[in-house]
């Protein structure tokens, strides 16, 4: 007996109903991006490892899916290297390419490669899958879609403001209540400076970014393991646990970071973004959260994260400013800021809260019953007119028993069935049945179209 087929952990198949829901998500996000003047691009699923490595920090590099070279890749490996069993070293010999970890780094590579064709500031969006060799769990997958929007070639903070408006608009359209969290890497840098651990900024941000997941005690333990002094850890506590309104937090930070020019610059930027957004009348809550660190190496200014308020799940959107990203590809001085919607987590949230609009997940609206060759030929004429009017319609392909065809309509939740037998053909009409109410009505093609498009 053949082994039952399976799929890799952390990946999923999607049924037609699930794809209808996913397309509702993608189309909603795409429509909002278009409202703000963003244009779509795509990049390859695989990138050179030299493009990807070193852009996500040590932890991110470990999560890259590497693609084994084709051909005789053992020919360049010595016996000594094989016997060493050094996985990282051997991988560098076997693999030159990797699956993309996110859409931001490939976008930076795209900008550098196509700089002569791009008009700046360049507002692009991209909706494609990414892959991470992570441990699968609820809300975390190894293959998932991101829906990114980025602006490069402008350092104006109005870009940050517009991206937050996009986030607010998208989740308002979905009907998901969210909290938009904002912070600034310059504030975090300033905090590292005033506690006397400026050179440990990456270790500090990686640790405090885990506060929600592992708790304060474990964050402090990790900080200590990274060589951060007890005194510095003690100074850090009241800062990362700072409470109050956004205005109160900013006022406190101005005092706390008074000796850090970088830190004060971060406060100034955050104040501008928050104050401007306040005049926009956002529908969702926005919060300055000093524990938001997003443990990635490339953010240099504002950073964002979005949490759903009515569902226990991780971040469903994130982003930030990454002024230095294109520099590693030989193109300095290009400032960029972007956001990324986690479509797969949004899918789960909409499912849990039952927020999908009925019209978004409905497939076929009308099924023509097939009684035989003559009846099918007559039905095809009405069917063509219905489709031309924008009605999603189909005909059962075989002249099967009526019970089987009606069962097909029920299973697929098709709301209307058109029955065309000899009597209907003689009158040039069809019997239209409402599958929910059971009501039947003899109608012309025009009346049928009117009933389904009103």
UniProtKB/Swiss-Prot annotation:
Organism: Bacteroides fragilis (strain YCH46)
Cellular compartments per GO CC: cytoplasm
Root EC class: ligase
Disulfide bonds, paired cysteine numbers: none
Keywords, sorted A to Z: Aminoacyl-tRNA synthetase, ATP-binding, Cytoplasm, Ligase, Nucleotide-binding, Protein biosynthesis
Oligomeric and partner information: Homodimer.
Pfam families: HGTP_anticodon, tRNA-synt_His
Any one GO molecular function term: histidine-tRNA ligase activity
Listed InterPro entries: aa-tRNA-synth_II, aa-tRNA-synth_II/BPL/LPL, Anticodon-bd, Anticodon-bd_dom_sf, His-tRNA-ligase, HisRS-like_core, HisRS/HisZ, HisRS_anticodon
Gene: hisS
UniProt name for this protein: Histidine--tRNA ligase
Main location: cytoplasm
Record GO biological process: histidyl-tRNA aminoacylation
Lineage summary: Bacteria, Pseudomonadati, Bacteroidota, Bacteroidia, Bacteroidales
NCBIfam families hit by this protein: hisS (TIGR00442)
Compartments, as annotated in UniProt: Cytoplasm
Catalytic reactions on record: tRNA(His) + L-histidine + ATP = L-histidyl-tRNA(His) + AMP + diphosphate + H(+)
EC code: 6.1.1.21
Family: Belongs to the class-II aminoacyl-tRNA synthetase family.
